[in-house]
Amino acid sequence: MTDLTLRRATAADDQVLAVLAARLSAFELPAWRAPHEIADADSRAMIAAAASGNPDDEVLIAERGGEVVGCLHVLAVTDFFGLRHGHVSVIATTEAAEGSGVARRLMEHAEQWTAERGLPLLTLNVFAGNARARRFYEKGGFRIEMVKYAKTVNSQPPTSKGQGTPNSQSPNETPNS
């Protein structure tokens, strides 16, 4: 099997980042979340981060044998409690790369990236319905810290349209610039 290489994403990767972002909703979602909104928001965030040049915001492309097989977006954020830490905003692999070690290698990079910056913690968010990802994270040593509950309160399902720009952080996290 060909070795896996990681490289920084460039503007030439915009299309492949959009395709990989679509994988982030390849499981049962809450009724108020639309797959295209998730893919659009995450691909926009990755494309912007790749173009920013911010050293505390990195987007990587994983390649094997010249083919793109995954991506990672990791950044430094400050949580609600004031703790600056690493945060995996996006990790995605192609369907063909599932179970081949690509995601594990990307997570190893995220951990190393976080440690190199002297940050004490690495966090991520995952939808409750993404059982495969949750098992992967737990096997990698991640533990549940907080559970977010949501409830629709009117007949109109929530949407991100008209409610500000979606971003890759949870509401209690802000990127560090």
What are the roles of these predicted feature ranges?
Residues 1-12, 154-155:
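Conserved N-terminal entry element of GNAT/NAT acetyltransferase domains
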Residues 25-48:
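Conserved GNAT-fold acetyl-CoA-binding loop/helix
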Residues 48-61, 87:
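A short helix-loop-beta-strand connector motif used in the catalytic cores of GNAT acetyltransferases and
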Residues 61, 67-76, 92:
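Conserved beta-strand in the GNAT
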Residues 88-98:
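A short, internal acetyl-CoA/4′-phosphopantetheine-binding micro-motif in the GNAT/acyltransferase core
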Residues 97, 101-109:
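Conserved acetyl-CoA pyrophosphate-binding loop and the N-cap/start of the following alpha-helix
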Residues 104, 116, 128-146, 151:
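Conserved active-site alpha-helix within GNAT-family acetyltransferase domains
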Residues 107, 114-125:
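Conserved GNAT acetyl-CoA-binding A-motif
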